[in-house]
Design a protein with these regions (language model features):
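Phosphate-binding site recognition
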Residues: 1-254
């Protein structure tokens, strides 16, 4: 055992982040973190507003999306700022963008359903949980918007789930006066499961409208980032999104 002098600091050994995809947990618990915060600068510098990252499983997609959430989110921005101290983005001219936007973050990575009835219920549950996070908006909503919000929040059959993200973007813009950063993680997990279990057309029909409204027709979202495994050419759910930037693992930038 090597003894240190009394004035020498003993560096605490960092833990390996096995299965950790929450950026805050990663930083606060001293896990070993390979600094990917330069991605934030690349996104902002590129001026691209719609980005699809395609990577294999276990390639850190969800952790990067969590990082983006903690960087941009206007909620708890002062506490979140501390997470980025001494990381690459803290030295960037774009660091002043930290904590400047409401953030919508939804993930389908845990989707495992084997039929459409359960699959649609799982999707609704994910959207309901998202709305629950923003239930404070209810105090400021007009009557018709409040009804639409509650139909989703209470998971009623009348809920307009295909427009849930686009409507929530508008509610947040009207509340904060700032455009949203929209993050959709593992967009294709339901598609892959549906293809393997015989309800592919049901999922595609739902997500065509879901993504068209959330990504293409959403003027209340400033930046939209999507992750998955499948390339866009394999699915028709993003048809019409002419300026969607697709970035694969083989590309250096972004």
């Amino acid at each position: 055992m090597i003894k240190k002098g009394k004035n020498e600091k003993i560096e605490k050994k960092k833990n390996l982040p096995v299965g950790i995809d929450n950026f805050e947990v990663m930083i606060q618990n001293n896990y070993y973190y390979f600094d990917k915060t330069g991605l934030i600068e690349e996104i902002l510098e590129s001026g691209t507003t719609r980005i699809l990252f395609t990577r294999p499983r276990r390639f850190g997609k969800s952790l990067n999306m969590s990082m983006l959430k903690y960087f941009f989110d206007v909620k708890n921005k002062d506490e979140n700022k501390k997470l980025f101290e001494n990381l690459e983005i803290s030295k960037s001219e774009y660091f002043d963008r930290q904590g400047q936007n409401p953030v919508i973050f939804i993930s389908f990575k845990d989707f495992e359903e084997t039929n459409w009835e359960n699959g649609f219920n799982s999707i609704k549950e994910e959207i309901k949980s998202l709305y629950n996070e923003f239930r404070f908006l209810r105090e400021k909503l007009e009557k018709s918007d409040l009804m639409d919000f509650d139909n989703i929040w209470l998971k009623k059959k009348e809920g307009n789930y295909s427009r849930a993200l686009s409507n929530l973007s508008r509610y947040l813009f009207e509340y904060y006066g700032k455009k949203v950063v929209l993050l959709i993680d593992e967009y294709d997990k339901p598609i892959i499961k549906a293809h393997a279990n015989g309800y592919y057309n049901n999922v595609i029909n739902f997500f065509k409208t879901f993504f068209e409204k959330a990504v293409k027709g959403n003027d209340y979202a400033e930046i939209k980032v999507i992750t998955g495994i499948l390339r866009i050419a394999k699915e028709g759910i993003f048809s019409g999104l002419n300026n969607l930037e697709v970035h694969t693992i083989l590309e250096k930038k972004i």
